[in-house]
Amino acid sequence: MSITFNLKIAPFSGPGIQRSKETFPATEIQITASTKSTMTTKCSFNASTDFMGKLREKVGGKADKPPVVIHPVDISSNLCMIDTLQSLGVDRYFQSEINTLLEHTYRLWKEKKKNIIFKDVSCCAIAFRLLREKGYQVSSDKLAPFADYRIRDVATILELYRASQARLYEDEHTLEKLHDWSSNLLKQHLLNGSIPDHKLHKQVEYFLKNYHGILDRVAVRRSLDLYNINHHHRIPDVADGFPKEDFLEYSMQDFNICQAQQQEELHQLQRWYADCRLDTLNYGRDVVRIANFLTSAIFGEPEFSDARLAFAKHIILVTRIDDFFDHGGSREESYKILDLVQEWKEKPAEEYGSKEVEILFTAVYNTVNDLAEKAHIEQGRCVKPLLIKLWVEILTSFKKELDSWTEETALTLDEYLSSSWVSIGCRICILNSLQYLGIKLSEEMLSSQECTDLCRHVSSVDRLLNDVQTFKKERLENTINSVGLQLAAHKGERAMTEEDAMSKIKEMADYHRRKLMQIVYKEGTVFPRECKDVFLRVCRIGYYLYSSGDEFTSPQQMKEDMKSLVYQPVKIHPLEAINV
């Protein structure tokens, strides 16, 4: 016996969507589910959780039978379920349930007696990673025994590797040891071709390649492709009476709806770019598509359209003006842009001195005024002075860098790093986008030491990694770079090779990443977690762009990721119900 019901994906609502010109129509998918299905998710807490009912409530669907209740049994299944929801990009619909499950998991973790978490290696590794990422205080010492285990199961080794990447402190030697052991073993399995499971093989390759450069939505698309019709049976059970292949189809539909909106945002960016006449400039990089891709990769939620657009516009403007300071304009013209922003007043065309200066300044002027008006509605106060201040700050940093290499000013590495983190552009992009997350941000919050530290750490990561990949080019251009300064600082000592200097700079980037993670994962801070997560996502952009090349200037892997994230919908195959 089987039943048929309609899973209705309703239009998304929220501040960002309500102001958009376009809306998405409701989409209905007919799903047939067998009442004989034994798809059971086992949960290990003392209150039943109706995941199926919650799903119906979120997406506005209706079913022909009462809500399905999931009964508590197994903590391992709970954790696998959370991991699956995250990997398929639909965890945002289940945050209250996830929070409940993790709270229960944390209570078990704190128990001194041995329980199921510590008896199962994979369960312990997943629990540690999910709890730490959520902000719970969990010691890595609980993982210490596993570093000496003779583990042959590749999936378990992979979970230990992922857990080791949650290292926050320099003295967490357990995680350092676990990382070295697990990564070497996984690489050996790849070299030997000893992972027969295709999906697992691909996962190991992906996580080993650039773990901290994995962008949220890029990873979601990859998971959906791996969990295609041939592998949907590998998805952990979600709810009794809701077959896993139906859940996969829902996740695919959700992805395609988000993608459709991101395509529309690309059209909006292209219209804005042309309206600003930035397409008439005959120098520098056109990064409209790159900006749209990067913001779509870190802001997946449909309601964050305004945040994505604000972030993307600032990536484009900062890149255009940075290129102007570096190559496109004269020193006097570059100074003129800073003077105009400080004055913040439109002028007759002849007073700008050049067409390029006029285009760049008016693009900044009109864009900031427009964003400030929208932010006023969101925040309930005027934020234009802050937005102008951010532009003065980054342009001043550009000027300082311009002066340092044109006048051949001798800088130490510390002097360089004290200001160069601003010029990478993370601060201005992030603080603009935060205005549109539906969270009120006071002036005190934005001027706090915590805000400065978050900006400095994420910017330092991106700056240092950028310097490693652009060192040889910038050396030819006689431009100051942290790798070159590192070499110069050790010139009188033992010989330091370029590889040594690059390794040292990468270690500094990892240090700032861990400091950033400490703030993001800490409870009771000035910023709510939703805001702090943005800094962590931007940190991943740095690793994505600059881990093995300069993907921002010469995209290679990004071209493929851009196709799958922005342009190519997930193909939804008709899936038959599972009858047991």
UniProtKB/Swiss-Prot annotation:
<protein>
    <recommendedName>
        <fullName>9,13-epoxylabda-14-ene synthase, chloroplastic</fullName>
        <ecNumber>4.2.3.189</ecNumber>
        <ecNumber>4.2.3.190</ecNumber>
        <ecNumber>4.2.3.131</ecNumber>
    </recommendedName>
</protein>
<feature type="transit peptide" description="Chloroplast">
    <location>
        <begin position="1"/>
        <end position="32"/>
    </location>
</feature>
<keyword id="KW-0460">Magnesium</keyword>
<feature type="binding site">
    <location>
        <position position="470"/>
    </location>
    <ligand>
        <name>Mg(2+) 3</name>
    </ligand>
</feature>
<dbReference type="GO" id="GO:0000287">
    <property type="term" value="F:magnesium ion binding"/>
</dbReference>
<dbReference type="InterPro" id="IPR005630">
    <property type="entry name" value="Terpene_synthase_metal-bd"/>
</dbReference>
<feature type="binding site">
    <location>
        <position position="326"/>
    </location>
    <ligand>
        <name>Mg(2+) 1</name>
    </ligand>
</feature>
<dbReference type="GO" id="GO:0010333">
    <property type="term" value="F:terpene synthase activity"/>
</dbReference>
<feature type="binding site">
    <location>
        <position position="326"/>
    </location>
    <ligand>
        <name>Mg(2+) 2</name>
    </ligand>
</feature>
<dbReference type="GO" id="GO:1901946">
    <property type="term" value="P:miltiradiene biosynthetic process"/>
</dbReference>
<feature type="binding site">
    <location>
        <position position="474"/>
    </location>
    <ligand>
        <name>Mg(2+) 3</name>
    </ligand>
</feature>
<dbReference type="InterPro" id="IPR008949">
    <property type="entry name" value="Isoprenoid_synthase_dom_sf"/>
</dbReference>
<comment type="function">
    <text>Involved in the biosynthesis of labdane-type diterpenoid including marrubiin and other labdane-related furanoid diterpenoids with potential applications as anti-diabetics, analgesics or vasorelaxants. Terpene synthase the catalyzes the conversion of peregrinol diphosphate to 9,13(R)-epoxy-labd-14-ene, from (+)-copalyl diphosphate ((+)-CPP) to miltiradiene and from 8-hydroxycopalyl diphosphate (LPP, labda-13-en-8-ol diphosphate) to manoyl oxide.</text>
</comment>
<dbReference type="GO" id="GO:0106239">
    <property type="term" value="F:9,13-epoxylabda-14-ene synthase activity"/>
</dbReference>
<dbReference type="GO" id="GO:0062206">
    <property type="term" value="F:manoyl oxide synthase activity"/>
</dbReference>
<keyword id="KW-0809">Transit peptide</keyword>
<comment type="similarity">
    <text>Belongs to the terpene synthase family.</text>
</comment>
<dbReference type="InterPro" id="IPR050148">
    <property type="entry name" value="Terpene_synthase-like"/>
</dbReference>
<dbReference type="GO" id="GO:0062205">
    <property type="term" value="F:miltiradiene synthase activity"/>
</dbReference>
<dbReference type="Pfam" id="PF03936">
    <property type="entry name" value="Terpene_synth_C"/>
</dbReference>
<dbReference type="Pfam" id="PF01397">
    <property type="entry name" value="Terpene_synth"/>
</dbReference>
<keyword id="KW-0934">Plastid</keyword>
<feature type="binding site">
    <location>
        <position position="322"/>
    </location>
    <ligand>
        <name>Mg(2+) 1</name>
    </ligand>
</feature>
<feature type="binding site">
    <location>
        <position position="322"/>
    </location>
    <ligand>
        <name>Mg(2+) 2</name>
    </ligand>
</feature>
<dbReference type="InterPro" id="IPR001906">
    <property type="entry name" value="Terpene_synth_N"/>
</dbReference>
<keyword id="KW-0456">Lyase</keyword>
<feature type="short sequence motif" description="DDXXD motif">
    <location>
        <begin position="322"/>
        <end position="326"/>
    </location>
</feature>
<keyword id="KW-0150">Chloroplast</keyword>
<dbReference type="InterPro" id="IPR036965">
    <property type="entry name" value="Terpene_synth_N_sf"/>
</dbReference>
<dbReference type="GO" id="GO:0009686">
    <property type="term" value="P:gibberellin biosynthetic process"/>
</dbReference>
<dbReference type="InterPro" id="IPR008930">
    <property type="entry name" value="Terpenoid_cyclase/PrenylTrfase"/>
</dbReference>
<keyword id="KW-0479">Metal-binding</keyword>
<dbReference type="GO" id="GO:0009507">
    <property type="term" value="C:chloroplast"/>
</dbReference>
<comment type="pathway">
    <text>Secondary metabolite biosynthesis; terpenoid biosynthesis.</text>
</comment>
<feature type="binding site">
    <location>
        <position position="466"/>
    </location>
    <ligand>
        <name>Mg(2+) 3</name>
    </ligand>
</feature>
